[in-house]
Amino acid sequence: MEVTLLGVAQDGGFPQVGCLKECCEDARRSPELSKMPVSLGIRGLDGSCHMIEASRMMAGQFDLWNSVGAPEWPPSSVSLTHAHLGHTDGLGLFGREVMGSSGIILHCSSSMGDLLDSTPSWSIMIEQGVIIPNYWAPLEPFEPTPGCGFTLTAIPVPHRSELSDNHALIIRGDKKSLLFMPDQDSWGETLGEELGILDWLDALEVDIALIDGTFWNYDEISSRDVSEIPHPTVTETLGLLGNRKQGDPEISFIHFNHTNPLLREGSNEYRHLSEMGWGISKQGAVYHL
């Protein structure tokens, strides 16, 4: 089975609406630099199609997925890590106003399910049979659909919980496993006091990890109150990881804010991270699990 990375940007995409800084103006002048919000497309061994996250840029993500051989549309299932804008604002595209889908299994936490039930534009999709919520049990592997040939496991990860809780997801195939963790508040809260990042990934039996790389450092968003948008910076994460050593898992960063210099392949930051042996995730990358 295979996983396609359908987007690498933070919720607002790149370029971001309202940003007139050079970072986004460059992307407007050169559309090939643009990036879509984080999302995964998964093709099961039985040919079934599954998505993680439901972005409003789903049309472009479908085109990208189709270019590498997406199996079927609409997907058999969608899984949501949490409730924030860029991870859920495309749900309505499955409804009667656009695709007119039916019977899409929506995997999420019970906390996210409560929000679905209390949000009219989503609850009506449940009533109409467009989506069928299915609540996962944290840390318990499950098949998104019977016979798909892979499992998902939801890992609780602290992140702003004003709307719902937040989870990372482990996708486990016959050969390898991949951790998808676009959002977290801090490594201290995620790991606790005893584990390091590599120890944690080893305990989860993860071969590939796509992790929160929202900000390179907080200097890039000096006009914002960072307590309102907590994420560990990439520089902090690199300090905890050190240089990659033989036997370490494959770790790549995702969920880049539009200000993040890792969006520019020629930047010093991009070069520094690469020299340490870690990865900058590429939109359209395919992982065979």
Please identify what each model-predicted range represents:
Residues 18-21, 65-68, 92-96, 120-123, ...:
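Short, glycine/charged-enriched secondary-structure capping and boundary segments
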Residues 51-55, 74-87, 107-109, 179-184, ...:
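Active-site neighborhood of phospho(di)ester-bond hydrolases with catalytic His/Asp-centered motifs
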Residues 1-67, 135-196, 202, 285-289:
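Core dinuclear metal-dependent hydrolase active-site scaffold
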Residues 177, 185-286:
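Cap/insert and terminal regions of metallo-dependent hydrolase folds
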